[in-house]
Curated annotation (Swiss-Prot):
Taxonomic source organism: Mus musculus (Mouse)
UniProt cross-references to InterPro entries, sorted A to Z: RNF168/RNF169_E3_ubiq-ligase (IPR051657), Znf_RING (IPR001841), Znf_RING/FYVE/PHD (IPR013083)
Subunit composition and interactions: Interacts with DYRK1B.
GO molecular function: K63-linked polyubiquitin modification-dependent protein binding; nucleosome binding; transferase activity; ubiquitin-modified histone reader activity; zinc ion binding
Cross-link for Glycyl lysine isopeptide (Lys-Gly) (interchain with G-Cter in SUMO2), residue positions: 273, 349, 498
Residues with PTM Phosphoserine: 12, 234, 236, 326, 390, 396, 472, 630, 679
Protein name per the record: E3 ubiquitin-protein ligase RNF169
Catalysed transformations (reactions): S-ubiquitinyl-[E2 ubiquitin-conjugating enzyme]-L-cysteine + [acceptor protein]-L-lysine = [E2 ubiquitin-conjugating enzyme]-L-cysteine + N(6)-ubiquitinyl-[acceptor protein]-L-lysine
Region (Disordered): 1-46, 100-153, 515-537
Gene name in the database record: Rnf169
Record carries keyword Cell division: no
Gene3D superfamilies attached to this UniProt entry: Zinc/RING finger domain, C3HC4 (zinc finger) (3.30.40.10)
Keywords in alphabetical order: Chromosome, DNA damage, DNA repair, Isopeptide bond, Metal-binding, Nucleus, Phosphoprotein, Transferase, Ubl conjugation, Ubl conjugation pathway, Zinc, Zinc-finger
Compartment list: Chromosome; Nucleus, Nucleoplasm
ZnF (RING-type) ranges: 61-97
Length: 694
């Protein structure tokens, strides 16, 4: 590489001088080494000895005067660049000349690059400044260098800064947003407060209205409870619905519930229930004394009922639930005091289990454990005024699980049908009133008296005595049938006047006294004590219900058979099939008819039919059936008034049949509709109602 500078000749001369000096120094070194005993290059190859760092004047390449960047490791320890060493080894060195560039390349490849790089790095770090002038061109390069011209500064361009918002604008906007949010929250809070206030005012107003309504209801309940309080005393599951419980404005077709019972009748029912609630374990003396104390006012109150006040409770009374009246009713003693307003206000609550929709399943299940037929534990007794008070017998039927007639129908009926149902109801009431109770205690002998009572007879003597009294009353009615034919045309309507009742009562009393005297002379089958009791019973007053029963029996007899046979001894006793059928329902018990006055035969009309009860014990006692003479049935009525009444009663019978047929039709339709979907009242205890017999 040629040196760059102003004088090329001077540089070449300097380079030649340097090479010569180096060659001489190299030879001197070899000689010194030979003297020391080291093997020469001629005899053996010399070992490569790395010298120390070169001096500053020797740090450059003799060929190009540059710092060797890539030093070639020569055997003579000369420092040369790789380019100079490859072209020609130092000409002044004997070791370098024969080897030449080929050896240098092999040496550099074999010795590795580590030592060469170490030496080059040492040279660059050791003396960089003295080598720079020679590298740049020798002495000429060491002169002052021209300073570089400064770069021109770029021209300043002013640009207007972009303003996103004015100072304080964002904070003002945030403040507005916070203010709006606060106003909205305050408005919602005010709305909520207003709503709560309105709700509170509405609730207070509702409470005030409820209190006012409650006060008005309490006044109404107080007024109604004073009139019908005894009718609300029943909450038993199977207790018979009283007339007070049936007061509703809706008048159904088959179960009419309009009722207007008097307070006296309800009080009598209450006292009667209190009597029934006595325990069966009480002694006979205690029961007789208690009934003697309570029965007279009750009997007097019961007899005040007129046909006009008798309500139409319903035709299907057998479907209503009945409670066993012989079981003690413990709720009556608890509810007797009605002094406080709270007890009166509690009366308007609905009954617990009267409705079939009741959810009281416990009381419904208790019906399975109640007896089907219950007999009272108290025997019939004689009242101080001479009347005989007999207990009731409760007869009920098993359940019918396939249908239910408890619910009332929702359709109306015509006034004509309602009138016919009223007549049917009256007939049922008559039959229940005249039914005889079955005694459960031991019957004493004839003439034996219970302590605390006048005279109580056995159950076998009582039916005969009761029948004689009823028969005498029927005779009186048959005698006065002619004069009162115009008054009886409207019978059995509810609008019967009290004048007719008074007339019937007077006639029945007079004839009862006559019957008493005749029974004292002609009675053959009864003892002296029995005759005295018959006389006392015949002289006692009869209630209006029994009188109406006899009248209905007489008129129905005239209508069906158009015969009015008269008996010479009894003075015109009606003895037709209809009369005997009704009297048989009076429950003579042993299947015979006994006449206490003249022992006249009364037709039985049971020829060829099965007897309802056995009469073997009666035949053993000497009592036999008596058949009527055929001559009594050949008489024909001659009174046109009675014939007219008979025709009317026959028409009423046809209307009753029509009402029953319509009821069956409606009932069949209702069962058809409810057959697919079951009803909740399919398991009800169906029993006959005894509302009219109380």
């Amino acid at each position: 590489m040629a040196a760059a500078g102003p004088s090329t000749r001077a540089s070449s001369a300097a380079a030649a001088a340097a090479l010569s000096r180096r060659g001489r120094r190299g030879r001197c070194d070899e000689m010194a080494a030979a003297k020391a005993g080291a093997p020469g290059p001629a005899s053996s190859p010399a070992l490569l000895v790395l010298r120390s760092a070169p001096r500053p004047e020797e740090s450059g390449c003799t060929g190009c005067l540059e710092t060797p960047g890539e030093v070639a490791a020569l055997p003579c320890s000369h420092s040369r660049c790789r380019g100079c060493a490859s072209r020609a080894a130092g000409p002044g060195c004997r070791r370098c000349r024969p080897r030449g560039s080929g050896w240098a390349r092999r040496r550099a490849r074999d010795d590795g690059q580590a030592a060469a790089e170490l030496m080059g790095e040492r040279a660059r770090r050791g003396q960089p400044e003295p080598c720079r002038p020679r590298r740049d061109g020798g002495a000429a390069a060491s002169g002052p260098r021209p300073e570089p011209e400064p770069l021109a500064e770029p021209e300043f361009i002013f640009r207007t800064p972009i303003k996103l918002s004015k100072p304080g604008e964002l904070s003002e906007e945030y403040g507005c947003l916070r203010k709006l949010r606060g106003e909205k929250l305050q408005e919602e809070k005010d709305c909520d407060d207003q709503i709560h206030k309105l709700l509170q005012e509405d609730s207070e107003m509702g409470k005030r209205k409820a209190d006012e309504q409650k006060k008005r209801d309490e006044a109404v309940v107080l007024k109604t409870s004073l009139e019908q309080c005894p009718a609300r005393l029943s909450d038993s599951e199977n207790e018979e619905p009283s007339r007070g419980q049936m007061m509703q404005t809706h008048r159904s077709a088959f179960v009419s519930k309009n009722s207007s019972c008097s307070l006296a009748f309800l009080a009598g029912k209450l006292n009667t229930k209190v009597q029934r609630s006595q325990s069966c374990s009480d002694t006979v003396q205690d029961r007789v004394r208690s009934r003697l104390r309570t029965a007279p006012p009750n009997r007097a109150k019961i007899t005040t009922i007129t046909p006009g006040s008798t309500p139409i409770i319903g035709v299907l009374l057998s479907t209503q639930n009945n409670r066993c009246l012989s079981a003690p009713d413990l709720t009556i003693e608890k509810r007797l005091p009605f002094g406080s307003l709270s007890s009166l206000a509690s009366l308007h609550k609905p009954e617990r289990s009267i409705s079939p929709e009741s959810n009281d399943s416990i009381s419904e299940e208790l019906n399975h454990f109640k007896p089907i037929v219950c007999s009272p534990c108290t025997p019939p007794k004689r009242l101080p005024d001479g009347r005989v008070l007999s207990p009731l017998i409760i007869k009920s039927t098993p359940r019918n699980l396939t249908r239910s007639l408890q619910k009332q129908t929702s359709y109306e009926a015509s006034p004509r049908i309602l009138k016919k149902w009223e007549q049917i109801f009256q007939e049922r009431q008559i039959k229940k009133t005249l039914s005889k109770a079955t005694l459960t205690s031991l019957a004493p002998e004839a003439g034996e008296e219970f302590p605390g009572s006048d005279t109580i007879h056995s159950s076998k003597e009582r039916p005969s005595l009761a029948f004689n009294t009823r028969l005498s009353r029927v005779q009186v009615l048959s005698e006065c049938a002619g004069p009162t034919s115009t008054a009886l045309e409207c019978f059995p309507s509810v609008n019967q006047t009290k004048v007719e009742q008074d007339c019937v009562r007077k006639r029945s009393r007079e004839f009862s006294l006559e019957t008493c005297h005749s029974s004292e002379h002609g009675g053959a089958s009864s003892g002296p004590s029995l005759e005295r009791e018959q006389c006392e019973e015949s002289g006692s007053t009869v209630d209006a219900t029994l009188v109406k029963t006899c009248i209905s029996t007489v008129m129905k007899t005239a209508a069906v058979n158009s015969l009015l046979p008269k008996n010479d001894v009894l003075g015109g006793v009606l003895k037709t099939k209809q009369q005997l059928k009704t009297l048989n329902h009076f429950d003579l018990g042993n299947g015979i008819l006994v006449n206490s006055l003249g022992e006249e035969p009364i037709p039985s009309l049971r020829r060829g039919r099965k007897r309802r009860c056995k009469t073997k014990h009666l035949e053993q006692n000497g009592v036999k059936k008596l058949r009527p003479p055929s001559s009594d049935m050949d008489l024909a009525p001659k009174d046109p008034g009675l014939l007219e009444v008979g025709r009317k009663l026959q028409q009423e019978e046809e209307d009753q049949q029509l009402a029953l047929q319509s009821h069956r039709m409606f009932d069949s339709e209702r069962r058809t509709m409810s057959r697919r979907k079951g009803s909740v009242d399919q398991y009800l205890l169906r029993s006959s109602s005894l509302a009219g017999a109380k």
